[in-house]
Amino acid sequence: MKVTPGFKASDLPLARTLTLGGMKVHALEAGIQWLDGGAMFGVVPRPLWEKKIPPDSRHRIPLALRCLLVEAPNALVLVDTGIGNKESEKFKDIYGVDNAGDPTRLEEAIRSLGFHTGDVDLVVSTHLHFDHAGGNLVLREDGTLAPSFPRARFVVQKGELGFAGSPNERVRASYMAKNYAPLVEADLVDVVEGPTELVEGVRLLPTPGHTPFHQSVILESQGEKAIFLADLCPTSAHLPL
């Protein structure tokens, strides 16, 4: 799909399905955000990256808020939750957030597959930046926060949770306590440390870089294997560059 400066979330399908051995894996498109292209590509010269992803008038490029829904043999596992519905209109303008309102686009994607938020058993955060963990909690009409997935346990690396609570100045704006602290207080978080076999067919592997305790998700079924890299590789354009 060609990415243009006018690219919208509605240009993406709600969900795409891959069969991995005997397991179904669904890529959920929870929306898009627009971030500074130079910041995303770092030392790569602009003349190179803008050929891959043209920026808008504010020098931003669109990034998919992509989550993963895994039909593991013994659990329904959601990996990352996008931005959610808690942010202000000012925030949405700054970051170019396009993820629908109520229900969020993530919830629509889950419903499109015949599931509901209450069917999710485990929610894995690859890391706790707002664009990956913002949908962990939902803002209700009365102004209170509630878990977006009422039956789920939330899984995060111990180091990531600690770092989120005391980040350095460079990344402070990316971490928001409202996206995870209420879950910790409600004892809904399962902290893991290092490589972890989550459930049959789903393993967690620390892949530090984007954050010190970022983790990727390895899926295996009937001899086939896939890995969800999350922000270890922000876009496909990063690979040839």
Walk through the language-model features, giving the residues of each.
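Active-site metal-binding loops of divalent metal-dependent hydrolases
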Residues: 30-31, 81-84, 128, 159-160, ...
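Metal-dependent phosphodiesterase/nuclease catalytic metal-binding core
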Residues: 69, 203-205, 215-240
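A short, conserved alpha-helix within the catalytic core of class I
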Residues: 135-141
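Short acidic, glycine/proline-rich loop/turn micro-motifs
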Residues: 88-93, 167, 239-241
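Metallo-beta-lactamase
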Residues: 1-115, 119-131, 141, 223-230, ...
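Short acidic/glycine-rich loop or secondary-structure boundary segments that cap or lie
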Residues: 36, 163-166, 198-201, 212-215, ...
